[in-house]
């Protein structure tokens, strides 16, 4: 039985000039997703996708590399201006933002959308190292 040759799907070039960069900086990783105004993903990247493993994923440099990668992918689709939404307490927040500026995007606004509980669930026990 001969296998049929698989069709390679080429990524369609969307022509979007303005987008929203969602930077999710947790203690363990940094994820960057660039979407259009409606929230449809255009490009994404994370520190883990860039080859960083373990505790190196949470470094500012890993966030910078991931943001540059997501920015280059989004620039191929014609994105020039970005609104940035930053979420989470991680160390890659500012470095991801600077990397997006360095790629050449015009950043119109920066919003912190970190969810803050109004005394929600009980936190986990303290770490003893």
UniProtKB/Swiss-Prot annotation:
Mind naming one GO cellular-component term on file for this protein?
ribonucleoprotein complex
Keyword Zinc in annotation: no
Q: Which GO terms describe its biological process?
A: translation
Name the job this protein performs.
Located on the platform of the 30S subunit, it bridges several disparate RNA helices of the 16S rRNA. Forms part of the Shine-Dalgarno cleft in the 70S ribosome.
| UniProt xrefs under NCBIfam families | PRK05309.1, uS11_bact
The subunit structure is: Part of the 30S ribosomal subunit. Interacts with proteins S7 and S18. Binds to IF-3.
Q: What is this protein called?
A: Small ribosomal subunit protein uS11
- Origin organism is Rhizorhabdus wittichii (strain DSM 6014 / CCUG 31198 / JCM 15750 / NBRC 105917 / EY 4224 / RW1) (Sphingomonas wittichii)
